[in-house]
């Protein structure tokens, strides 16, 4: 009887392991906090005002993943609009910009399909669209107006890990690096200006996921 009990427990463990699997054909969604942190030195120059910096911002991040095989996934990153303040040492904050950075990734999941712990890496492409950008009163007092930023295409890389709590739920930690370079168009003292802007942010996401 004891041997039968041990055997039954072993079979149950094996079955529960496979039930936790990331398997071909599965679809899952994650939601959590996503923080965009421009790299050190990110920013650019604003004519005679000199260099400027860009603040971090945290929003709701969403990822949608389809497992093409037990080890290959395709993921789309989405989020609520990120909001960054732009400032210079001389003037403080002078502008606010908003953007959305949808990113499509091809992923490789390490380990066995039945593992509860699935680290992965990914590579793909990022598209960033900028909107609702403008100078605040400090910027206008400095003679700045008519701010717009050009949309950007760039490469993206990713590392992350899923931990499967049960058949339906998981928790995730992931990090992206995105190549985001744009051009800022604006007026300074009524004269049209065009300056290059580099963001190249790290994106950190902590989330919970549900598998369908």
Curated annotation (Swiss-Prot):
It is found in: Cell outer membrane. GO terms for cellular component: cell outer membrane. Keywords: Cell outer membrane, Membrane, Signal, Transmembrane, Transmembrane beta strand. Belongs to the OmpW/AlkL family. Residues 1-21 form the signal peptide. It comes from Escherichia coli (strain K12). GO terms for biological process: transmembrane transport. It comes from the Bacteria. Transmembrane segments: none annotated. The keyword Membrane applies. This is Outer membrane protein W. Changing residue 12 to A: In strain: ECOR 52 and ECOR 60. InterPro entries: OMP/PagP_b-brl, OMPW. Acts as a receptor for colicin S4.
């Amino acid at each position: 009887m004891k041997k039968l009990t041990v055997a039954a427990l072993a079979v149950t463990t094996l079955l529960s392991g496979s039930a936790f699997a990331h398997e071909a054909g599965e679809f899952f969604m994650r939601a959590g906090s996503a923080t965009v942190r421009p790299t050190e030195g990110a920013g650019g120059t604003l004519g005679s005002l000199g260099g400027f910096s860009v603040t971090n911002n945290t929003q709701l991040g969403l990822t949608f993943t389809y497992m093409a095989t037990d080890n290959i996934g395709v993921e789309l990153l989405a989020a609520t609009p990120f909001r960054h303040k732009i400032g210079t040492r001389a003037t403080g904050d002078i502008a606010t910009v908003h953007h959305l950075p949808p990113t499509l990734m091809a992923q490789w999941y390490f380990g066995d399909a039945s593992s509860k712990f699935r680290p992965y890496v990914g590579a793909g492409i990022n598209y960033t669209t900028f909107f609702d950008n403008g100078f605040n009163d400090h910027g206008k007092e400095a003679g700045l107006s008519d701010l717009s930023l050009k949309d950007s295409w760039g490469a993206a890389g990713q590392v992350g890990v899923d931990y499967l709590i049960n058949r339906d739920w998981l928790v995730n930690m992931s990090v992206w690096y995105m190549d985001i370079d744009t051009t800022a168009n604006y007026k300074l003292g009524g004269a049209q200006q065009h300056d290059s802007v580099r963001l190249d942010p790290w994106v950190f996401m902590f989330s919970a996921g549900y598998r369908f």
